[in-house]
């Protein structure tokens, strides 16, 4: 068996085309384009690269983006004031606080400070609570991007045993909520999980989001499983790896995402979707 490739770049282009068309329709009605505020703290090269990518994606679909670059020495209260300013700005429909933040700043406090209806990352407790209640509003970008990508398989997910490796607030936990919403039976594995291999072997849908290359051995993968690799590690300037060895895993899976070119583009595309959705509540 050779797995079919779940191409995140192609799927993301479909999402972006829909967003661009909807923005064009807004403009035809004389309404303003959606506005996104991105708050970037410090000079972390990876964060700067991600923000630049998001800026280009916004420009391509017609979203106005403004990046507020803050020094690494900024205090939590100063950063909170900037968020408050964006909350009040009627031309800003979405707010994104680029993570990670410097060690002296508590991200939870600041993510909660963003207005829920402008929380385009989907991390506010209100938006996560809506997902828990099966009434989603703005949804976390990576998990919802994965769900959109899974539609490309045309597989019925109802009743499938989905195993998530990783329990972060950004991916693992909201991913579990999304899969429950899709009527999967969900197992979440984390650093205290015993017999990880046995859990992986039972997965009909395997989602790995740890950031440790090779953490999942390919022989653990159930033949015919759908495999989603959210991991992203830069091994050298020119080499990026996921959490699973793609070349050996594709011999067992029915569908698999590459790294790069799998989940990453879907995260950005979902951010654009969320920004449009947020704008539509104001316009």
From Swiss-Prot:
NADP(+) binds at residues 166-168. Its EC number is 1.5.1.5, 3.5.4.9. Signal peptide: none annotated. One of its GO terms (biological process) is methionine biosynthetic process. GO terms for molecular function: methenyltetrahydrofolate cyclohydrolase activity; methylenetetrahydrofolate dehydrogenase (NADP+) activity. CDD domains: NAD_bind_m-THF_DH_Cyclohyd (cd01080). It catalyses: (6R)-5,10-methylene-5,6,7,8-tetrahydrofolate + NADP(+) = (6R)-5,10-methenyltetrahydrofolate + NADPH; (6R)-5,10-methenyltetrahydrofolate + H2O = (6R)-10-formyltetrahydrofolate + H(+). Keywords: Amino-acid biosynthesis, Histidine biosynthesis, Hydrolase, Methionine biosynthesis, Multifunctional enzyme, NADP, One-carbon metabolism, Oxidoreductase, Purine biosynthesis. Pathway: One-carbon metabolism; tetrahydrofolate interconversion. One of its GO terms (cellular component) is cytosol. Homodimer. Catalyzes the oxidation of 5,10-methylenetetrahydrofolate to 5,10-methenyltetrahydrofolate and then the hydrolysis of 5,10-methenyltetrahydrofolate to 10-formyltetrahydrofolate. HAMAP family: THF_DHG_CYH. Belongs to the tetrahydrofolate dehydrogenase/cyclohydrolase family. This is Bifunctional protein FolD.
């Amino acid at each position: 068996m050779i797995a079919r490739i779940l191409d995140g770049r192609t799927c993301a282009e479909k999402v972006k085309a829909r967003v661009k068309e909807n923005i064009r329709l807004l403009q035809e009605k004389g309404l303003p384009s959606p506005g996104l505020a991105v708050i970037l703290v410090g000079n972390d090269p990876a964060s700067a690269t991600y923000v630049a990518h998001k800026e280009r994606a916004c420009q391509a679909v017609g979203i106005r983006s403004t990046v507020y670059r803050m020094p690494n020495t900024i205090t939590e209260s100063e950063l909170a004031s900037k968020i408050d300013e964006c909350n009040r700005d009627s031309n800003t429909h979405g707010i994104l606080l680029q993570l990670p933040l410097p060690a002296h700043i508590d991200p939870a406090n600041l993510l909660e400070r963003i207005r829920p209806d402008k929380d385009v990352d989907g991390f506010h407790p209100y938006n996560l609570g809506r997902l828990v209640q099966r009434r989603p509003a703005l949804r976390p970008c990576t998990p919802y991007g994965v769900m959109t990508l899974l539609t490309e398989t045309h597989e019925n997910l109802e009743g499938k045993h989905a195993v998530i490796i990783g329990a972060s607030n950004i991916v693992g936990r909201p991913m579990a909520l999304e899969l429950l919403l899709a009527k999967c039976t969900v197992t979440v594995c984390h650093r205290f999980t015993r017999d990880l291999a046995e859990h992986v072997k039972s997965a009909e849908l395997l989602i790995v989001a740890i950031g440790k290359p090779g953490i999942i051995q390919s022989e653990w993968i159930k033949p015919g499983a759908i495999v989603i690799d959210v991991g992203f590690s830069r091994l050298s300037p020119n080499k990026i790896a996921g959490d699973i060895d793609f070349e050996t895993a594709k011999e067992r899976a029915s569908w698999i995402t590459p790294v790069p070119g799998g989940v990453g583009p879907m995260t950005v595309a979902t951010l654009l979707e969320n920004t449009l959705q947020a704008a539509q509540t104001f316009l």
